Amino acid sequence: MYELQQHRRFSALDEMLPAFYYCYLLCFPVSSDNRAGTSELLQTSLSSLAEERPYLTGTVRRDMESSVRKGHLILDIPNPFEDLRIVFNDLRGPKSQWKETYQDLKDTGMPPHKLDANLLAPLTAGIGETRKVMSVQANFIHGGLLIAFCFHHNFVDAYGAGRIIARFSEHCNGTVDLKNSADPEGDGTGSRGIADLLDVELLKKQYKFEDLESDPNLWRLNCLEFRGVNDFRWPDFIPALLPVRKPPVISSMFSFSSDALAEIKAMAQPSQSGAWVSTNDALVAFLWRHTMRARFPSSITESEPPNRKSNVVVALDGRKDLSISPTYIGNCLFHCFTDLPINMVGSESTHLGDIAIRVRQTITAARNETLLKAVVGLAATHPDCQAIKYANDNLGPDLYVTSWIDLPFYKLEWGPLGKAEFFRIPDRQFESLCCILPPKDGVVQLITSMEEDHSKRLRSDAEFTRFATHR
C-alpha cells in the first residue's frame, strides 16, 4: 500500500525550490462509450483521496513577515473541507485543436512533442496563477484517456508525486477502506507534518548560517549558487508563462534497450582495479559526453578553452540516507555535481570509465548522513528563501539528469482502466533537463530538451545513435 503521511508542513528543503508546477501524464486506452463511467470512477476516487488526506486540497502561501524567516512557506488547508475536483476535458469534438487519436499516438510511441501542455495540463509548467498544491485533468481523446497530474514543486518532489498518484490508483482500484484503515505508524512527522531533521524552526536552533555558508559543497548539494544572495529574487509566485527561450528548445525522446545499457556499462568499466560503477552512472557519463559534444563540437578534438568546465548534476533522493519514512512526500532532493574540463568530457581520447567513476565518486560522497544534515542546515538557516540563485546553466556547459526509474507508474492498477500504457511529460516541460523515465518491457526511455541545432547534432551522432533509438 502506498500510504501517505498523516499531516503535511513545509520543510527547509521545500523552501529552497522555485514556485513552479510540473506535470506528469498517464495514458490509457479507453473506448468512447466508457467516458461517463470513467469520469465517475476518477472523481469518486480523487474525492476519497482528498478526504483521506485533506492537505492535498491546500494552497501555498509565502509569508514575508514570518518570524521563522523571510519568505517562509505556509500550507493553507480549507476548513471546512473542500473537495478536490478533476477538470474534465473532451478533445474529441470537430472544433477541437486536438487531432491525433490514441492509436495514432500509440503507433508512434506517444512522442512528447505531440503532448501540448497548453491543451492537456490544468496548470501549465511555469504558471502560478493558482496556488493549489496539486490539480488533475482528465483529457478524453478518440480511443483514449490522458490524465494530467500537476504538482507544486514546493509541495512534493518526484518521489512524493509518484506516491500520491499511486495512492490515487489504490482508491480507483477499491483497495482503500477509509473507515477501517489505520493511519501509518511511525512516519516520523507526527501531528506537525514534518520530520525533525527537516524542520526549519528546530534546525535554526542547531545550526548557524555563518558556520555553514563558507562551504561551497553545501550550496551545490542544495543546487544553489555559492553565496548567491541579494542579487536575485524569485517572485512570490510566477505570474505567467515563462519567457520563450531564444533560440527555442525542443524535446526529444530516446530509447535504450537492455542490451544497449549493458554494452554502455561495459564501455564504462573503470580502469582502476576494484572500482565499480552502476548502470545509471554509465548512462549518465554517456549522456554527459554526447550532450557536450552536441553543444560544443570542438570539445571532441579538445579545442575548447582549457579552463572551461562542465558539470553534470544528478538528482539524489535522500530519504534512505536520512532515515526518512517512505510515507513522507515532501522534497528530499539533493543535487550531486561532478565537474570536469569540457575537453575531457567530449574528447575521443577520454575513456568513458574515467567519466563514470567520477560520477560514482560524487554520488558516494554525497550519501553521507552528517553531510546531508549540514546541507539541510544551510537550507534552514538561509536568511531569505526568496533570495536564492540556481547554480547551473543546463543549456550551456552543464547537464542536469533526473531519474524516475523507480517510480511505480507501470505497475499500478487503476480498477477498470487497468494499467497505464505510457508515462510521459508534456512537450518542453523540463527545459534543459534530461529525464530518465521508468522502464517498460526492459526498455529505458529518456526525454531531453535542447536547442534545435544541438538536438540535430545529437541525433546525427553515430556513436550515440548506435545505442539510442530516437522516438
Swiss-Prot record:
Gene3D superfamilies named in the record: Chloramphenicol acetyltransferase-like domain
Stored InterPro entries: CAT-like_dom_sf, Plant_Fungal_Acyltransferase, Tri101-like_N
EC number assigned by the record: 2.3.1.-
Pfam families documented for this protein: Transferase (PF02458), TRI-like_N (PF22664)
GO molecular function, one term: acyltransferase activity, transferring groups other than amino-acyl groups
Keywords (A to Z) from UniProt: Acyltransferase, Transferase
Superkingdom of origin: Eukaryota
Induction note: Expression and the subsequent production of PR-toxin take place under static culture conditions (oxygen limited), whereas no expression of the PR-toxin genes occurs under the strongly aerated conditions required for optimal penicillin production. There is a negative control of the transcription of the PR-toxin genes by the penicillin biosynthesis gene product(s), or by a regulatory peptide encoded by a small ORF inside the penicillin gene cluster.
Pathway it works in: Sesquiterpene biosynthesis
Subunit structure: Monomer.
Its job: O-acetyltransferase; part of the gene cluster that mediates the biosynthesis of PR-toxin, a bicyclic sesquiterpene belonging to the eremophilane class and acting as a mycotoxin. The first step of the pathway is catalyzed by the aristolochene synthase which performs the cyclization of trans,trans-farnesyl diphosphate (FPP) to the bicyclic sesquiterpene aristolochene. Following the formation of aristolochene, the non-oxygenated aristolochene is converted to the trioxygenated intermediate eremofortin B, via 7-epi-neopetasone.
Family: Belongs to the fumigaclavine B O-acetyltransferase family.
Name this protein carries in UniProt: Eremophilane O-acetyltransferase prx11
